[in-house]
Amino acid sequence: GCATTTVKSSPEDFIRIEGQDLIAPDGSKFFIKGTNLGNWLNPEGYMFGFSKTNSARMIDQMFCEMVGPDFTAEFWEMFKDNYVTRADIEFIASTGANTIRLPFHYKLFTDEDYMGRTVAQDGFERVDSVITWCRDNGLYVILDMHDAPGGQTGDNIDDSYGYPWLLESEKSQQLFCDIWRKIADYYKDEPVIL
């Protein structure tokens, strides 16, 4: 991934915008054809088949209540290691797709408790893997902070407390911007990211 491999790129390697069109490095119009990797880095209840336990926070709490925090932490590590793999990306590429949307929870780039970890989240490690797999298979990646600090919709999909606090909380807004700056700086030379 980007953490272990230096990506040598120039502006010509990136998809660019001309008017309303996306332009591929070869000069042709680029049309996004793809899918997303939902539920992997931002668990959602409906994707697990749950009817009432629907946000990442609630799912984690339910698991902790049912099997305890130690097994829950082990479960999340196994889940992240196996829910999406290189083979999945290879299959997606074989269908003719050219892009993957990667929804993620902001906590993957913080030291907040999330998916079994209490410090040193593994967001860059997880995204690095997807980027490497996508680069190897000719796919682009759209990074999607699906769960922003404070929540951006107030619905279960953003793991909020029922209100879009991101829109009112300066602390949440600052954290949102800080995380995106960190991600942008880390991946600034990676042309696979749209």
What does each model-identified segment do?
Residues 2-4:
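N-terminal Sec signal peptide cleavage junction
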Residues 17-24, 29-32, 37-194:
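Active-site mouth of glycoside hydrolases
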